Amino acid sequence: MIDQNLLRTNLDDVANALKVKRGFTLDVESVKALEEKRKALQVKTETLQAERNARSKNIGAAKARGEDISALLAEVDNMGNELNEAKVALDQVQAEIRELLLSVPNLPADEVPLGKDDTENLEVSRWGEPRQFDFEVKDHVALGEALNGLDFAAGVKLTASRFVVMKGKLARLHRALSQFMLDLHTEQHGYVETNVPFLVNHDTLFGTGQLPKFGEDLFHTQPLTGQDPNETQRPFSLIPTAEVPVTNLVRDEIIDENSLPLRYTAHTPCFRSEAGSYGRDTRGLIRMHQFEKVEMVQIVAPEKSMEALEELTGHAEKVLQLLGLPYRKVLLCTGDMGFGSAKTYDLEVWLPAQNTYREISSCSNMWDFQARRMSARCKAKGDKKTRLVHTLNGSGLAVGRTLVAVLENYQNADGSITVPEVLRPYMGGVEVITA
């Protein structure tokens, strides 16, 4: 959620920036009307409170003089009722302002390139050279099915399309990838491993920005409307990414600045309805309703967040480098960024069968956008005031897409797969996967 003070002091500039950079039209007149109403009610509330306090003191003085105070008591009582009504009205207006702000995307950092979609993203760097094959390249679906390791028909039978059953050595390779990633991040990059719920409440989804805007992209235990408020029927949602529960660990917390940065990692399944993705990537593991990911989250002091973004992105890059997978680093333009991001790098891995780079990690600095929604703050020792932390998140990596990249880049002419060296300890020493 963007800073409400920005709207109070620079409304027209903010509205213009949102329009130009985000394609978002802010209802300026509604904001102005609500802000005027809020200011009037704020003044009224403060005035009534001051008058009520003054009258209350008069009651004490009159009582000490032995005077009849019944009229004063009635006056203070009426003033109290009026004050309560004003407070209720003020709370209502503030709730309306918050509701409006929840739909407003984050403002991009100045260095983010202006653009309408992914065709205007900026390539920053490349690592590794795509392998030159002397045989006809197969895609991961053909390779996985020939190895009896990917069973998409079983996924359809058990659930629906965009689900898969992994078996045998490919299931183990998938597990090896996630274990390797976790070990790297915890042992070399300084992250604390967390094991978090896969079902979360709606406060958690509001905190990281999935709700209210992206409810249709989630799987819910109950419809978002008409929910039963009873404790036994509380509505939960399956997590679309571990970013959601892990980042919310600091919700409603005041963190000692000396303990920052906080670095967390988690390996979880992720669940996405893929609303709006009909017809896209219908073949294989690229776009699934259920997939696994190793997520990295950092909670940092505001002045450290841009430096932290470079560090976090480097941690994701290290996974690809150790696996020997060619990739490129891309700075997303304003039209391709996520709703809550101020700056995002995508890492795109080379897929030989598609003869192109495909996203395998997205690393974002959210500034204080999520922290404001979560009321996540920090305070230095000796300071009376708190300030909002900055939050960052990144895939380190998407496990299924990494499996795709390993299968395609390490395939052999006979359909076998050479196991990358760093994964062999997790595979019981297996060097080549055969049918």
UniProtKB/Swiss-Prot annotation:
Belongs to the class-II aminoacyl-tRNA synthetase family. Type-1 seryl-tRNA synthetase subfamily. It comes from Actinobacillus pleuropneumoniae serotype 5b (strain L20). L-serine binds at T241, A242, E243, E295, S395. GO terms for cellular component: cytoplasm. It catalyses: tRNA(Ser) + L-serine + ATP = L-seryl-tRNA(Ser) + AMP + diphosphate + H(+); tRNA(Sec) + L-serine + ATP = L-seryl-tRNA(Sec) + AMP + diphosphate + H(+). HAMAP family: Ser_tRNA_synth_type1 (MF_00176). It is found in: Cytoplasm. Homodimer. The tRNA molecule binds across the dimer. Consists of two distinct domains, a catalytic core and a N-terminal extension that is involved in tRNA binding. PROSITE patterns: AA_TRNA_LIGASE_II (PS50862). Its EC number is 6.1.1.11. This is Serine--tRNA ligase. PANTHER family: SERINE--TRNA LIGASE, SERYL-TRNA SYNTHETASE. Its main location: cytoplasm. Coiled coil: none annotated. One of its GO terms (biological process) is selenocysteine biosynthetic process. Catalyzes the attachment of serine to tRNA(Ser). Is also able to aminoacylate tRNA(Sec) with serine, to form the misacylated tRNA L-seryl-tRNA(Sec), which will be further converted into selenocysteinyl-tRNA(Sec).
